[in-house]
Amino acid sequence: MEGMITRRRFVQASSAAAALALAGTGGCGMKGSDRAVKIVVVGGGAAGLGVSARLVRLLKKAQITLIDPADRQFYQPGFTLIGSGVYRPDQVWRRQSACIPKGVKWVKQAVTALEPAKNTVTVAGGTVYPYDFLVLTPGIQCNWDAVEGLSQKTLGEGNVHSIYDFEGAQKTWRAVQAFVEKGGRGVFADTYTKHK
């Protein structure tokens, strides 16, 4: 299909932030290890996937567990392209299971407790995962309710839209199409400092 992002390209693009972060700290020159350690990575977004992929390549005997409840992995920069009609919604996501690096155990649960003194992570089902090293890449959650007059439920209804999430980007494109058809005056705003 023309315009589709391949799985390989998708994972490469969504892992760019993690790769840049590692490069900035000398990560590209890191040497591998034969130590048998347990590593838990909390968060399966671009950073969590990128770090997990890097660790599984460098640490041949490590047990790497990635914890994230999401079914889908989103290429979030693509949300702007959905909102402008360049991409279709199906072009910015993949099944999370297809993005987990080979050799990494995926736990599809939400984290409910971190106990650094005990080196453990507890998930929603009650299972406790011990670790030698913990990597936290949980991502963010937009707090729309902190903006007077907005809520996650009402955003995208009426004339206020955002491309900061998957559903919002689709609503934005529908609103742009309606605006082009009807005409009128459009007001676009951006925050002084990014909230994501």
Q: What is the predicted function of each stretch?
A:
Residues 130-139:
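Short hydrophobic core segments
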Residues 57-131:
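N-terminal Rossmann-like dinucleotide/flavin-binding domain of flavoprotein oxidoreductases
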Residues 29-61, 146, 152-196:
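Rossmann-like dinucleotide/flavin-binding elements
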Residues 47, 72, 141:
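Conserved Rossmann-like nucleotide-cofactor binding loop
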Residues 23-26:
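C-terminal segment of classical bacterial N-terminal signal peptides
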Residues 1-18:
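N-terminal secretory signal peptides and thylakoid transit peptides that target proteins
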Residues 17, 141-142:
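Active-site beta-alpha loop architecture of Rossmann-like, nucleotide-cofactor-dependent enzymes
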Residues 14, 125, 138-139:
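Glycine-rich, N-terminal phosphate-binding loop of Rossmann-like dinucleotide-binding domains
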